[in-house]
Amino acid sequence: MPQNADSLAVVLKCRDWENPGVTQLNRLEAHPPFCSWRNADDARVNRDSAQKRSLNGEWTFAWFSAPEAVPESWRTSDLQQADSVRVPSNWQMDGYDAPIYTNVTYPIPVNPPFVPADNPTGCYSLTFSIDADWLQAGQTRIIFDGVNSAFHLWCNSRWVGYGQDSRLPSEFDLTHFLLKGENRLAVMVLRWSDGSYLEDQDMWRMSGIFRDVSLLHKPATQIRDLRINTRFNDDFSRAVLEAEVRTTGERRDDLRVTVQLWDSETFVGEKTAPLGSEIIDERGAYPDRTTLRLNVEHPALWSAETPHLYRAVVQLHAADGTLIEAEACDVGFRQVSIENGLLLLNGKPLLIRGANRHEHHPENGQVMDKETMIKDILLMKQNNFNAVRCSHYPNHPLWYTLCDRYGLYVVDEANIETHGMVPMNRLSDDPVWLPAMSQRVTRMVQRDRNHPSIIIWSLGNESGHGANHDALYRWIKSEDPSRPVQYEGGGANTAATDIICPMYARVDQDQPFPAVPKWSIKKWLSMPGEQRPLILCEYAHAMGNSLGGYAKYWQAFRQYPRLQGGFVWDWVDQSLIKYDDDGRPWSAYGGDFGDAPNDRQFCMNGLVFADRTPHPSLYEAKHAQQFFQFALLPGAECQIEVTSEYLFRHSDNEVLHWSLALDGNPLTAGVVTLDIPPQGRQIIALPALPEAETAGQLWLTVRVEQPQATAWSQAGHISAWQQWKLGEKLATQWPQHAGNAPQLTSSGTAFRIVAGEKRWEFSRQQGVLTQFWIGEEAQLLTPLVDQFTRAPLDNDIGVSEATRIDPNAWVERWKAAGHYQAKAVLLQCDADTLASAVLITTAHAWQYQGETLFISRKTYRIDGNGEMQITVDVDVASGTPHPARIGLSCQLAQVAERVNWLGLGPHENYPDRLSAACFERWDLPLEEMYTPYVFPSENGLRCGTRELLYGAHQWRGDFQFNISRYGQKQLMETSHRHLLQPEAGTWLNIDGFHMGVGGDDSWSPSVSAEYQLSAGRYHYQISWR
């Protein structure tokens, strides 16, 4: 007895999900998103179409360990054990199966095209009704915008088709499957398919119907494709809108196509032509298509700065004017080109201020909603980003529409990555895999080509370089010559890219890896015969407490025109919310779901946390990328030169606030309106500035504010700022106490000093300050001791983990040398009474396994006013690794509500990441001095500090500090921030010197030499009262 062609058994026998030659069955051709309006005015204003219906919502769902476990009866009716889930969603976020986070390593055994027999399978079903008029005429389609990883579709128990490529739509014709009354859809989704070998991106591996599902009803004769291009004369004063329209359905001689162009409510013009009017070659024209050209005088040009959009409405109608169907899209008049080694937009060289962005939501997984998309765009714009790379797959279709409207340049990237293959180009150089790769590239272009925000196509990510790439590069250049193509794989400079687009190339340092060397970005420009622009597809790995040295990249970008910026890795931490036994949420990373293999916290590389609150590094990026640059001009008068890096917009909504302050105390201020043309300058002459009358540092600060709200910012938004230290009137010390010295007493174990209501006790056996009283209140919970270590940053750890030690990682070097285990050996502890002060002198050798790592000498000078001046000299052994810090640490007994300091702030800053910080007097709650990185580490440092006030205490000097309820030991030993427990009192770290955080990448030591503590001797001094 022959098998039913619709049966599960037939589908299982074919095993299409293990055949790279089968990427779809019965799927319709790719095209731009359609709405099939039946009223041209509805199309013009983008009104909801009555011909489009969402199927999002509650679906019936059953989960199985493998497709073979799905009962045949499911195809025809819901199973008794079925539950319900919301579509779109990832089933792992609903408690089925586990998400897996891995970066390079495939989550399944590598045996392409085969996948494990244990292949989790989700069975979805939905019952719905169809309007009677949809059944009478026309075509009804179903559109799945994203399903991971592959799926088969049935309608009313009849098999419809198959699709894979999780990040592009699969669209099927349901017309002949639909019935009057209720209809039932059944969708069998497989977690793994041969397509999974092309989707080895650095992200959580999740499954399910995770993008929108909708029905679309089109007439029998219909628009099947729409391609929009804009062309210009030399000075962009005249343009041509070119609309290529393709149709399908009944052949009719009376069909006409009209394109109308609107500028908001203003009608610009229209053009009408019959089908078949465009002669292609000597054999004639395509009978089902036409190309319409509409001249536009003085078009308003689109750019990320000025995202002016027109609206094109395309109508298919009969000769008598009867409208059959209308489609529409936003149109941006803009031109992308590469000339003389520069990437140009509308004839101007771009400077890409970009971020790589994964589609990630902490609670919804890879399901993106409009609100989150808009939040990302607004944050990018507010922080001076102008570009985004869709890493590493085509995004939700709404994303591009929003980028068009708000103004972001987009690199649209094919859903291809084979990072875990050995060699990496194993599939991209295999012709068997060309059809699968081709579908992912060509369908992306066919869906997204009409978006002006997309300025570059990308062939994918980290898939080596093979003949398949070369073929697909040539296809795109033929199909869409209006955009360049980039591809990093195989060394960033192969023939398959128009742009040199390396990842993690450094500014001045070569990384001569075998086969694929990463030269410094400066060197790359001078390679023989190389004339392409260089735009880093990934740089500045923002993992945890990172982004050190970011300003150095931007100095290079501004110095060398062909260095045209790059895309930070990456935008958002990919942590996921889990709940503890008491229902409290916490942030999870790789391994927290029992997932194996996993790459632990490597999924958290964002400039923002998963909930989109900023990392401190975001402020550094904002400052480095700001569109206004400032220079303090030399001369007797104080003049500031403001340069605009905007290419297309006049500064019509900016005022410059300037202020002069002495040690944070305002002296004078003013406001000037900025009136700067694109790429222009304005000189601002300030009035005569007052001189400092008392000791302190004189700082001039300028801030650019937008008085009026914009589409992406609120009124009062600060877009740029800069500070200059104009001078310093020195007072080398506080006035020395001229009265009697404090009282010094000693015993066999301690030195005790009394000055008024203050008392100090130093251990003679340990040589440290063990206690400090104010009145009867003890101020210390732990002694004041040297500190040379920090709770490791992600950049300090690199790729090291328990099962794979990288001896070159900073933390492993520090461990091996004994920095964390070193013990202090007392060399000296003396006390002397001077005329007006008591002097305690100590010396320690910090040793590990008999080796001396550091020698620390301290002098404590305590006067009768109760001021203790601490002078520290540290010698670093020549053979030991450069230390993380040179400073002091103690646990204060007091827990005060606020912290006040004069120094750089307000946000966390480190020696190689402090360009965005300003020198002022700051005051913040104690809890805001801690940065809640999901993976705990050293955090919260404030550099350039002159004074610190906390509770009853005051410190002065030139130092860096962090202060919080969490000690370095707990930060080092705790895996997740929600496990941290506030400790007794407050931990204070005061550093004379602190190593940078690095960030060129996070897997090799990346702290630049100038920010390492490489000197043999260090000296610093603080006063405590």
Curated annotation (Swiss-Prot):
Cofactor binding, per record: Binds 2 magnesium ions per monomer. Binds 1 sodium ion per monomer.
A Pfam family reported for this protein in Swiss-Prot or TrEMBL: Glyco_hydro_2
Residues annotated to bind Mg(2+) 2: N598
Gene3D superfamilies: 2.70.98.10, Galactose-binding domain-like (2.60.120.260), Glycosidases (3.20.20.80), Immunoglobulins (2.60.40.10)
InterPro entries listed in its UniProt record: B-gal_small/dom_5, Bact_Beta-galactosidase, Beta-gal/glucu_dom_sf, Gal_mutarotase_sf_dom, Galactose-bd-like_sf, GH-type_carb-bd, Glyco_hydro_2, Glyco_hydro_2_AS
Keyword field contains rRNA processing: no
Keywords annotated in UniProt: Glycosidase, Hydrolase, Magnesium, Metal-binding, Sodium
Sites where the protein binds substrate: N103, D202, E462, E538, Y539, A540, H541, N605, W1003
Keyword Ribonucleoprotein: no
GO molecular function: beta-galactosidase activity; carbohydrate binding; magnesium ion binding
Cofactor dependence: Mg(2+); Na(+)
Record EC number: 3.2.1.23
Active site: E462, E538
Signal peptide: none
A cellular-component GO term for this protein: beta-galactosidase complex
SMART domains: Bgal_small_N
Subunit structure: Homotetramer.
Record-stated family: Belongs to the glycosyl hydrolase 2 family.
Protein name from the UniProt record: Beta-galactosidase
Organism field: Citrobacter koseri (strain ATCC BAA-895 / CDC 4225-83 / SGSC4696)
Protein encoded by which gene: lacZ
